[in-house]
Design a protein with these regions (language model features):
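Hydrophobic alpha-helical targeting segments used for export or membrane insertion
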Residues: 1-11
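Processing junctions and N-termini across compartments
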Residues: 11-12, 63
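Compact alpha-helical subdomains of small soluble proteins
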Residues: 29-75
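Mature extracytoplasmic domains of secretory-pathway proteins
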Residues: 21-29
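Intrinsically disordered, low-complexity Ser/Thr/Pro-rich tracts
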Residues: 2, 18, 35-39
Length: 75
């Protein structure tokens, strides 16, 4: 099994976040749904481990979301 990395996780979550925002969900609900999807795909313990081990998680997450769907991040 391939080790889940922070970049892989954030890219997956970022894509889903944009899709949920495009459906009209707010930021918080979109984020929760996206991480729920990631937990289903990669396993909740793997997702938790990556988040716990990461440094500057918030900065990386916002940067990826702003790149993937700036219309929902930058206002």
């Amino acid at each position: 099994m391939i080790e889940l990395t922070l970049i892989t996780l954030l890219n997956y979550v970022g894509d889903n976040f944009c899709e949920y925002r495009n459906l009209g969900h707010d930021n918080y609900k979109s984020l929760l749904l996206s991480y729920s999807d990631a937990s289903n795909k990669f396993g909740p313990l793997e997702v938790k481990k990556v988040i716990e081990k990461s440094k500057n998680f918030k900065v990386a997450a916002v940067a990826i979301a702003a790149t993937k769907c700036p219309q929902h991040i930058v206002k």
